[in-house]
């Protein structure tokens, strides 16, 4: 690897470290994350489920978070219900073909979501039509709505019961903050649910 590549990677790591440090000191983000964990715990304790949506890298995050809830984060425990609505290629392509991509998640929320469930919608920009439509449909169906976005995505909050805002406008850094915070939320959820079993 040449020096220029080393410098680019080092620069990214330095910016990533600084962004994580800002997030760790962001009292609004931390408070929001705690409330989000509590809302998800309430739903899972009641036998409800967590639905998760996102596009691109946020779709990967949706799958990652669902895996932590259904599988386990760190502790051996019963499985809990979480579904990433980003994984069913037949549903995604059928809905996209018949209704348009803007409705690929809303249609699934309509079919799978019930009152008392939670929708976690991840959008770094806060402006993705497919994500906003999913939130609207979730509201119609009585789901608790949670959003993850970046510094420029505050308008998304109008559709969310709780909005977590990563303190950055750089998409890769927003994604890193989202996933790191999601891990903290998963650990909090797991600790609360494990306490129920003790």
From Swiss-Prot:
What is the first-listed, main subcellular location in coarse terms?
cytoplasm
The record's GO molecular-function terms, alphabetically, read: carbohydrate derivative binding; D-sedoheptulose 7-phosphate isomerase activity; zinc ion binding
PROSITE patterns to which the protein is assigned, alphabetical: SIS
Question: Which top-level group of life is the source organism from?
Answer: Bacteria
Q: Which reaction does it catalyse?
A: 2 D-sedoheptulose 7-phosphate = D-glycero-alpha-D-manno-heptose 7-phosphate + D-glycero-beta-D-manno-heptose 7-phosphate
Keyword line = Carbohydrate metabolism, Cytoplasm, Isomerase, Metal-binding, Zinc
In short, the EC number is 5.3.1.28
Which pathway does the database say it acts in? Carbohydrate biosynthesis; D-glycero-D-manno-heptose 7-phosphate biosynthesis; D-glycero-alpha-D-manno-heptose 7-phosphate and D-glycero-beta-D-manno-heptose 7-phosphate from sedoheptulose 7-phosphate: step 1/1
Domain SIS span(s) in chain numbering: 40-198
Q: How is the cofactor bound?
A: Binds 1 zinc ion per subunit.
Q: Where does substrate bind?
A: 55-57, 68, 97-98, 123-125, 128, 175
What Gene Ontology cellular-component terms does the record carry? cytoplasm
Cofactor dependence is on: Zn(2+)
Cellular compartment(s): Cytoplasm
Q: Where does Zn(2+) bind?
A: 64, 68, 175, 183
Among the GO biological process terms of this entry, one is:
carbohydrate metabolic process
Pfam families (alphabetical) = SIS_2
Which CDD domains does the protein's record reference?
SIS_GmhA
- Which protein family is it in? Belongs to the SIS family. GmhA subfamily.
Any other noteworthy remark? The reaction produces a racemic mixture of D-glycero-alpha-D-manno-heptose 7-phosphate and D-glycero-beta-D-manno-heptose 7-phosphate.
Q: How does it assemble?
A: Homotetramer.
The free-text function statement in the UniProt record for this protein reads: Catalyzes the isomerization of sedoheptulose 7-phosphate in D-glycero-D-manno-heptose 7-phosphate.
Task: Kindly provide the name given to this protein in its UniProt entry.
Answer: Phosphoheptose isomerase
- Source organism of the structure: Bradyrhizobium sp. (strain BTAi1 / ATCC BAA-1182)
């Amino acid at each position: 690897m040449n020096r220029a590549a080393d410098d680019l990677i080092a620069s990214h790591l330095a910016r990533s470290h600084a962004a994580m440090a800002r997030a760790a000191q962001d009292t609004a983000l931390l408070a929001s994350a705690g409330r989000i964990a509590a809302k998800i715990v309430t739903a899972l304790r009641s036998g409800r489920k967590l639905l998760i949506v996102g596009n691109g890298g946020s779709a990967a995050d949706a799958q990652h978070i669902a895996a932590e809830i259904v599988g386990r984060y760190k502790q051996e425990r019963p499985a809990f219900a979480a579904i990433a609505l980003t994984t069913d290629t037949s549903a995604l392509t059928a809905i996209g073909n018949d209704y348009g991509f803007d409705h690929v998640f809303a249609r699934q929320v309509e079919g799978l979501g019930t009152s008392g469930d939670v929708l976690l919608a991840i959008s770094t920009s806060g402006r993705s039509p497919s994500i906003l439509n999913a939130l609207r449909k979730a509201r119609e169906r009585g789901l608790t709505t949670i959003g993850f976005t970046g510094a420029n995505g505050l308008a998304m909050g109008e559709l969310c019961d709780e909005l977590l805002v990563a303190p950055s406008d750089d998409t890769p850094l927003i994604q890193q903050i989202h996933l790191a915070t999601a891990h903290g939320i998963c650990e909090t959820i797991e600790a609360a649910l494990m306490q129920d079993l003790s």
